[in-house]
C-alpha cells in the first residue's frame, strides 16, 4: 500500500460512534469527507463546549474527531440525495459508517449495491453489537456496550456496584479496531482489486480489554473484579497535590519489593523497618486488614508531604513502579508529551481562537501525521466535492433547490 495515504478517499458517515476511525486516516493524509445530514452530525450536540457556549461548531468532541476532514451535507431520505451519495461512494476507497444495521440496505445503499458501482470499495460498519445476531437491531450506547461486554463489572470492586470508566471507552476501542481492519481491507483491495465489508462490534472490541477475567473463570471458576483497596502495596495513595499509583510488588516477587524497601530506608521514613520483613512477600498478609492499614499508615505519612512529581522522580531512581495520577492540567504540562510534540495548537477561524488538540497517536519514520484542517462547518465543502464528482453547476443548483444536498452559503 506504500506510505502515501493521500491517494485514498474516505467517506465518513459516522456520528458519536466511529469518527476516530476516519480521523486516523485523515491524520495520515487521506482525503476524508465527513458526510452528515443538513441538520448536522449528532456529535455537534455533544459537550463539553468551547468556552462553555453550546453551538453547532462549538462541540469540542466534534472539533477534535473531525479535524482534518472536509464537510459534505446530504439528505439520504431524498431520492436524489441517495443518488449523490452513491456517486460519492463510487469514487471512494473506503466508507466508514455507524448506521443502524439495515438502515442503508433499506435505502438501496447496501454494500452489495455500492460495490456494484465500485468493486474496490471497502465498507467498515461500526455498531454497538455488529450487523448480525439477536442484538444486531437493538439500539445501543457506550454504556450498554460497556455493561454487556463485562467492562463495567471488571472496573468495579467487590462489594460495590459496577463502575463506568470516563468518556466513551467502548466507542474508542471499537474505532481503533475498525481503523486496523479498514487498513487491512484496503491493503487487500489494492492487491486484488476487490473490496470487502468489515463488521466491527463495540461489545466485542471492549471484551478484548477484560485482561485475564475470562481465564479466571475458565481455570479457577472465579469471577474477577477490580482489586480496589485489597493491597496497599498496589493501589492509589494521596500526596500533597493529588494521588500517585504504586505497584511495589506483584505475586511473591521479592526482587520487586526490595527496591521499595531501600527507597523507604533512604528517605528515612518513620517506621520503615516494618517493610524489611519477608511477610510482605506473602500475598495473604498484604491483603489482610493488618497488612493494608500498616502499609497505608507508614507510606502515606511520607507521601502526604510530597508532590506527585517529586514522588515519581524519587521512586524511579529506586526502580519502583510509581507514577503520578495525572489530570488534564498535568497532561498539558507533561515534559514527555511536550518533547514528542503531542499537543497541537491550531487557530479556528470560525471560533476566532486557538484550540489545543491531542496529536499523533503514533509516529512513523517518514510518514508524518498531521492534524489537518479544522473540523468542517455543515456543508462547508459540498459544492467543491460535487464538482469533483463531475456534477455541472446547474445540476448542483438543482440539487440544492430540491434539498437533496446542503451547501454553506458564502
Curated annotation (Swiss-Prot):
Heterotetramer composed of 2 BbsE subunits and 2 BbsF subunits. It holds the Pfam family CoA_transf_3. GO terms for molecular function: succinyl-CoA:(R)-benzylsuccinate CoA-transferase activity. This is Succinyl-CoA:(R)-benzylsuccinate CoA-transferase subunit BbsE. Keywords: Aromatic hydrocarbons catabolism, Transferase. Its EC number is 2.8.3.15. GO terms for biological process: toluene catabolic process. Coiled coil: none annotated. Catalyzes the reversible conversion of (R)-2-benzylsuccinate to (R)-2-benzylsuccinyl-CoA. Inactive with (S)-benzylsuccinate. The keyword Transferase applies. Belongs to the CoA-transferase III family. Pathway: Xenobiotic degradation; toluene degradation. Induction: Induced by toluene.
Amino acid at each position: 500500500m506504500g506510505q502515501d495515504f493521500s491517494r485514498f478517499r474516505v467517506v465518513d458517515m459516522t456520528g458519536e460512534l466511529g469518527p476516530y476511525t476516519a480521523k486516523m486516516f485523515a491524520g495520515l493524509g487521506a482525503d476524508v469527507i465527513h458526510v452528515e445530514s443538513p441538520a448536522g452530525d449528532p456529535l455537534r450536540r455533544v459537550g463539553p463546549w468551547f468556552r462553555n457556549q453550546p453551538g453547532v461548531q462549538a462541540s469540542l468532541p466534534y472539533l477534535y474527531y473531525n479535524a482534518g476532514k472536509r464537510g459534505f451535507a446530504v439528505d439520504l431520505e431524498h431520492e436524489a440525495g441517495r443518488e449523490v451519495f452513491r456517486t460519492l461512494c463510487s469514487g471512494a476507497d473506503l466508507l466508514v459508517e455507524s448506521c443502524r444495521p439495515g438502515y442503508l440496505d433499506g435505502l438501496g445503499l447496501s454494500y452489495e449495491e455500492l460495490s456494484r458501482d465500485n468493486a474496490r470499495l471497502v465498507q467498515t460498519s461500526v455498531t454497538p453489537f455488529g450487523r448480525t445476531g439477536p442484538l444486531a437491531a437493538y439500539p445501543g450506547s457506550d454504556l450498554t456496550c460497556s455493561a454487556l461486554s463485562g467492562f463495567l463489572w471488571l472496573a468495579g470492586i467487590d462489594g460495590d456496584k459496577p463502575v463506568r470508566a470516563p468518556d466513551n471507552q467502548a466507542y474508542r476501542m471499537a474505532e481503533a479496531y475498525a481503523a486496523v481492519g479498514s487498513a487491512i481491507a484496503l491493503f487487500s483491495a489494492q492487491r486484488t482489486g476487490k473490496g470487502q465489508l468489515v463488521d466491527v462490534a463495540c461489545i466485542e472490541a471492549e471484551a478484548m480489554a477484560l485482561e485475564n477475567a475470562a481465564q479466571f473463570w475458565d481455570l479457577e471458576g472465579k469471577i474477577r473484579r477490580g482489586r480496589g483497596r485489597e493491597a496497599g502495596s498496589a493501589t492509589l495513595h494521596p500526596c500533597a497535590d493529588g494521588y500517585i499509583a504504586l505497584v511495589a510488588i506483584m505475586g511473591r516477587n521479592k526482587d520487586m519489593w526490595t527496591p521499595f524497601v531501600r527507597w523507604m530506608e533512604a528517605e528515612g521514613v518513620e517506621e520503615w523497618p516494618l517493610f524489611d520483613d519477608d511477610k510482605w512477600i506473602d500475598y495473604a498478609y498484604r491483603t489482610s486488614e493488618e497488612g493494608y492499614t500498616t502499609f497505608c499508615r507508614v507510606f502515606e505519612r511520607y507521601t502526604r508531604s510530597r508532590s506527585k512529581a517529586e514522588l515519581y522522580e524519587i521512586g524511579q531512581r529506586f526502580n519502583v513502579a510509581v507514577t503520578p495520577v495525572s489530570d488534564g492540567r498535568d497532561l498539558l504540562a507533561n515534559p514527555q508529551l511536550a518533547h514528542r510534540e503531542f499537543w497541537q495548537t491550531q487557530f479556528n477561524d470560525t471560533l476566532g481562537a486557538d484550540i489545543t488538540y491531542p496529536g499523533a497517536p503514533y509516529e512513523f519514520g517518514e510518514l508524518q501525521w498531521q492534524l489537518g484542517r479544522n473540523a468542517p462547518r455543515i456543508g462547508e465543502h459540498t459544492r467543491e466535492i460535487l464538482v469533483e464528482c463531475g456534477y455541472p453547476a446547474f445540476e448542483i443548483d438543482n440539487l440544492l433547490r430540491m434539498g437533496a444536498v446542503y451547501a454553506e452559503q458564502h
